[in-house]
């Protein structure tokens, strides 16, 4: 299993930060356009445990992939977890943590994932998946800074 941990300071209050990140409609705003992110089902303004979000993405070679994510756990103003139910990964478990700190919010993402195809998945991870995942987080960092200026 691979794991990526990423911390980010956001210069806003905890409630504003939580409201932005817990609204599924904002995911597209912090996803690179080349990913072709498109939500396929109706989504509420605010997430809830058990919420299923179906979307397509084109992360590699412009090949569309269907992905279904479930919001499996929410602790209001503290963290939420999304897990892939259908998609390109064998396992995808993404924790989003929020902590009030002086001057704003410290966000921490903890992403744990496993690729399919055994050793071929490990090769793909080394060749491009790891760098692509990091690139997406770097893009999100920049967008979050723009949004919360």
Put a short name on every predicted segment.
Residues 5-11, 38, 56, 70, ...:
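Generic structural detector for well-ordered beta-strands
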Residues 84-135:
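Beta-strand/loop substructures that line and gate deep hydrophobic ligand-binding cavities in soluble
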